[in-house]
Amino acid sequence: MQVILLDKVAHLGSVGDQVTVKSGFARNFLIPQGKAVMATAANIAHFEARRAELEAKAAEALAAAQARAAKIAEIAVVSVSATAGDDGRLFGSISAKDIADALTAAGVAVAKSEVRLGEGPLRTTGEHEVKVHLHPEVNAAVTVNVVAE
């Protein structure tokens, strides 16, 4: 199925690219999320008329993500407290939601879906490096200091 991308999609293309994808991927993911439209003659003409607007919107989203990444770089370290045993292991864990809440409290709005925990939830006290995926082209890193209560 031929589609026109309205947004940058990882491993597929950027705004305005006309790509061939499997019909299920287009119908179940790209089109419902507003990332693509079917490549009909009418949609191609409509897209060409709106190309400048969509590219400006994509550039604005990239600039906003870069500004948020700069704020996260300024913060550098975020502390999260949790109950822990004597050996430094937590009773429970620190999830992406907890880290997103801590970053939001520090002044940068971050959704839990943007926090990338490579090895799963944090289960020990100490400092942990966590990646924040703000945009397909913008990633930031923050150090999470887990402190025992």
Swiss-Prot record:
GO terms for cellular component: ribonucleoprotein complex; ribosome. Belongs to the bacterial ribosomal protein bL9 family. GO terms for molecular function: rRNA binding; structural constituent of ribosome. One of its GO terms (biological process) is translation. PANTHER family: 50S RIBOSOMAL PROTEIN L9 (PTHR21368). It comes from the Bacteria. This is Large ribosomal subunit protein bL9. It comes from Actinobacillus pleuropneumoniae serotype 5b (strain L20). Binds to the 23S rRNA. Keywords: Ribonucleoprotein, Ribosomal protein, RNA-binding, rRNA-binding. The keyword Chaperone does not apply. The keyword Metal-binding does not apply. The lineage of its organism: Bacteria, Pseudomonadati, Pseudomonadota, Gammaproteobacteria, Pasteurellales. InterPro entries: Ribosomal_bL9, Ribosomal_bL9/RNase_H1_N, Ribosomal_bL9_bac/chp, Ribosomal_bL9_C, Ribosomal_bL9_C_sf, Ribosomal_bL9_N, Ribosomal_bL9_N_sf. Signal peptide: none annotated.
